[in-house]
Amino acid sequence: MENQRIFLFLALSILGLLLWTSWERDTRAPVATEEVVEAEDDVPAPAETPDEAPDPADGETPARDRAEVEDERRVRVVTDLMDLEISTRGGDIRRVDLLQHGTTATDDTPFRLMADDRDPLFIAQTGLIDDSDNRPDHRALFRAERDEYRLSEGEDEIQVRLTWADENRGIEVARVYTVQRDSYVIDVRHQVRNAGDEEWRGYSYFQLRRNPDPPGTTPWYIYTFTGGSIYSPDDRFEKISFDDMDDTSLSRDIRDGWAAMIQHYFLGAWIPPESQALRYYTRAQAGNEYVLGMSSGRQTVQPGGEAEFVNRLFVGPKEQDRLRELHDSMTLSVDYGFLTVLAKPLFWLLDNIQDIVGNWGVAIILVTLLIKLAFYKLSATSYRSMAKMRRVQPRMQQLKERHGDDKQALNQAMMELYKKEKINPLGGCLPILVQIPVFIALYWVLLESVELRHAPFMLWIQDLSSRDPYFVLPLLMGATMFLQQRLNPAPLDPIQQRIMMALPIVFTGFFMLFPAGLVLYWLVNNGLSIAQQWYIMRNLEAIEAGKAAKSGKADKDQKKKD
């Protein structure tokens, strides 16, 4: 009876822990920020001397530039992995389609990560700031040599060159975008040449602008974080929600860090050169838009001199091998919650097995088998305890009938029975306790790992990261739960009996919302548990039968002697 109560409590705890995990991930302490005066500015101050920054214009296109809007052009760049558009207005990256990732499991249309013509808006911006009103920021009009670039066979990279000039001051700026084959990285380089008579002093900035996802974008039963994030060696990985940006604006000097806008499976991130100190900032803009970026220190370019400002933009899936190549800490953007220490080894194991078998579903089955083998002895102890509980079930029923409503006397008599039969009433709960963190860790692995996005298994399961479209796996899982209950000792309390009978139905309904890969894990785990429990119970019954036969034979022999 105690075993059943514990099982019921732990089973329901799975639901509570999943809900708590979602709440905990969404209500972490906000990033420490500096209070700043609210403004509509979308151009940052320089890293080292923010008080010297010129007054920036607001986020709208200045009146002096509105007549030039018609001159804006879009430069299309197509590689083996990306199809993107760069606007000559500021050189913004305003559209990015990921050619190797479909919109859904059944729609091969490339997934659009960045766009400026829909909700949510998501674009990348960069520019240079100096003391002049005419400056090459993200509102300036650049010139492009061509309207389209395509990576041809035999080519390893594409370079897109945009130019801007202030003839009155003799300042010439070239912005060069470089995209490599088999890469989601866009290298951005500002080249400043001073052909004038006076020195030029300015700084660069690199930022991401987006707004929150519209309500209803993701189902209520799937929680993923969408918002900003920064990394620094001192404070490690920090998430910055849009609400945090509304409350306060970040302004922090960071060396050897990065800043990103992250969402489910994908991210856009500025990753500056190593050891470069930059000022990281956030802004809440009008129109429900938010800016996260970084600005460099001022540089001085003497007449006849040149200077460069460089950065890297990653726009793509959170594939951990690629992220690790960019920066050791970039894999932290794949957020597995408070069980990261368990989830990362699980993903590593899944990933390596998948490399061998070539199927993520088969990898999940094999990982489940390995986990079961790792805890085989622990589970065996539990199932032996359950088998003993089942064997003394008739005697427990007699105790209940004898003591009636005297629960204290009943509990005392049951404890004496447990002691006499050497039964640990809590022995069956330990494997369940062990499975709960594994279950939750695997849940986040399946939910957060883009490697499993749209990963097929077999037959009707074409996406292990989404729910079973025909609910076959949840129904089978519910059937295995019901079968497991038949192997366990039944509760003495009629109310508990009804609750335990309803539990497989409740869990079947809940698992209909879970990713198919997670249901597959639970189904296989239940099947292996049933097989192990049946094997142990059969052996114990054989042992008991052998003991009874020996005892009977001994009694007969004794009678013959008498």
Curated annotation (Swiss-Prot):
**Keyword annotations from UniProtKB, A to Z:** Cell inner membrane, Cell membrane, Chaperone, Membrane, Protein transport, Transmembrane, Transmembrane helix, Transport
Biased composition of type Acidic residues is found at 35-58
Where does the chain cross the membrane?
4-24, 330-350, 356-376, 426-446, 499-519
Region spans: Disordered? 33-71
* Subcellular location(s) per record: Cell inner membrane
Concerning NCBIfam families, the annotation shows: PRK01318.1-3 (NF002352), PRK01318.1-4 (NF002353), yidC_nterm (TIGR03593), yidC_oxa1_cterm (TIGR03592)
Similarity remark: Belongs to the OXA1/ALB3/YidC family. Type 1 subfamily.
The name under which this protein is listed is Membrane protein insertase YidC
Supply the source organism for this entry.
Answer: Alkalilimnicola ehrlichii (strain ATCC BAA-1101 / DSM 17681 / MLHE-1)
